[in-house]
UniProtKB/Swiss-Prot annotation:
Function noted in UniProt: Plays a stimulatory role on natural killer (NK) cells cytotoxicity. Activation by cross-linking of the receptor induces Ca(2+) mobilization and interferon-gamma production.
Annotated consequence of substituting residue 7 to F: Decreased Ca(2+) mobilization
Protein name: Killer cell lectin-like receptor subfamily B member 1C
SMART domains: CLECT (SM00034)
Glycosylation sites recorded in the entry for this protein: 83, 169, 186
Keywords tagged on the record: Disulfide bond, Glycoprotein, Lectin, Membrane, Signal-anchor, Transmembrane, Transmembrane helix
GO biological process entries: natural killer cell activation; positive regulation of natural killer cell mediated cytotoxicity
Residue spans, topological domain Cytoplasmic: 1-45
Gene: Klrb1c
Record's miscellaneous remark: The anti-NK1.1 monoclonal antibody (PK136), recognizing Klrb1b and Klrb1c genes, is known to identify NK cells from B6 and SLJ mice, but not from BALB/c ones.
Biological source species: Mus musculus
Motif segment (LCK-binding motif): 31-34
Superkingdom: Eukaryota
Mode of membrane association: Single-pass type II membrane protein
Amino acid sequence: MDTASIYLGLKPPRTLGAWHESPPSLPPDACRCPRSHRLALKLSCAGLILLVLTLIGMSVLVRVLVQKPSREKCCVFIQENLNKTTDCSVNLECPQDWLLHRDKCFHVSQVSNTWEEGQADCGRKGATLLLIQDQEELRFLLDSIKEKYNSFWIGLRFTLPDMNWKWINGTTFNSDVLKITGVTENGSCASILGDKVTPESCASDNRWICQKELNHETPSNDS
């Protein structure tokens, strides 16, 4: 076979472009979504934004409602304390015929009776028999009374079966503050005579001294 026949039998190879043909072009409106789909997407986005705003508004409202009672309680507490402060500055007085000393009011009876009757009389006045706090308080009372020859019942008595002196509020007598001079017997109650505290029969007749804590109410004229 000659050379010319060989060349004629061979087919020419395809060009490179034939293996990489471009894909067929799409119609111009192939990527466009239908108008109804676009509208639905917009409505969904708007609904989502509205939902987020609603949740934020509700959370703010809940927080305000939770904090409101606390603020109201705080205002009430402040107002009550302001009222108390006002009362303290205005009504620091004892009833008529009572003596004021520090935070107590004192009343000296003008009649004599037993220790029990003296305590009952103080109770009717919203008070108790005298509970001596210290020597300074006792000196104030002695200087105010200025009666050296009269005995006055105080809220101290000898109790059984403890066999000990106790104040009527239940506290034990402290001999470092006061000294009791005299013989103590069963059924003894304490009275002050001058600057001395002495034991006496609770059935004896003496005058007495009442005391009550200073309060911030309008003073009464009861004596």
